[in-house]
Amino acid sequence: MQNKGVVLTLFLVVSMAIVISSTKEKRAVIQKKYVDFKDRKYPWKEECFETCARTFTNGDQSKVSEVVPDYFKCICYVLI
């Protein structure tokens, strides 16, 4: 009977730790930001990725979730 209590307690502690850690990961926010692009009217998507990553994440393209080329600018969706 004591083994069941120990196993149940251990299960509850581990499940609470998983819930707490997953809650912290979900706090990341995607922000919409703008970057001016003066080289051409409508920049290529790769250029927007590079420009957004360089401007907002010190070159880390994995934090840039999406980019939208626009008239002389790039719209960046950045994970903060």
Curated annotation (Swiss-Prot):
Contains 2 disulfide bonds. The keyword Protease does not apply. Residues 1-22 form the signal peptide. Expressed by the venom gland. Keywords: Disulfide bond, Secreted, Signal, Toxin. It is found in: Secreted. Its main location: secreted. One of its GO terms (molecular function) is toxin activity. GO terms for cellular component: extracellular region. It comes from the Eukaryota. Coiled coil: none annotated. The keyword Disulfide bond applies. Belongs to the scoloptoxin-15 family. This is U-scoloptoxin(15)-Er1a. It comes from Ethmostigmus rubripes (Giant centipede).
